[in-house]
Amino acid sequence: MALPKIKPYTYVDREHSNRVSWPVDPSRAVLLVHDMQVHFVQAFEGADLGEGNASPDAQINVAIRNLRRLIDAAHAAGIPVYYTAQPPRQNPEDRRLLIDFWGDGLQNDESARVLDALAPTDRDTVLTKWRYSAFVRSPFEDLLKESGRDQLIIGGVYAHIGCLTTALEAFMRDIQPFMVADALADFSEEEHRLACEYASGRCARVLNTVDVLADLQTAESAEGTEEARA
């Protein structure tokens, strides 16, 4: 049961019906680049894998560009950046029920590689991913607590599976989730939209990349004002 071949689509920008208006706070937030590995991205027709045949307007490529902006902004603001990455050649005892839905998963080191355009640096943390949620069989929650962080900015694939599940679990652990709609991609525009609608009404603030950057700029300006007064 392999991943489906995903047709290009564009996620239509819309006003999300958020029940919360949490601002992104650079002193509280971390960024999670979710499952942006070759195995998952190559399922998208026209995905930019560095081979020169990309469809620029396809949502996966919009997401890649926006994730790059978010990573750069996070580094500049001192926000820790985390990645999830599933390991290749998983033992059936580790993979278990995922086999029934998705088969054997990643089979080689190349398929497990994070895209070059988004590759982690030495300052970033890569979490081994075992289930839909980034928190399962992972030190993620402990790392957040140790660093005093309780906001989670999420971008990557797939919006309605791992990204949404991670947002839900963050919420249930009293960590404020932020789903960055234009830095996500999914099996279809409909599933992408449904994931964002569910998150905005049940567990997260859904926003776009420009909103994250604006919140960071507001926080930086406020900090500068406070320093000037001191």
Region spans (language model):
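Short acidic, Gly/Ser-rich segments with clustered Asp/Glu that frequently serve as metal-coordination loops
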Residues: 37-43
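Active-site metal-binding loops of divalent metal-dependent hydrolases
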Residues: 35-36, 87, 157, 183
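Short beta-strand segments at enzyme active-site cores
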Residues: 33, 79-86, 180
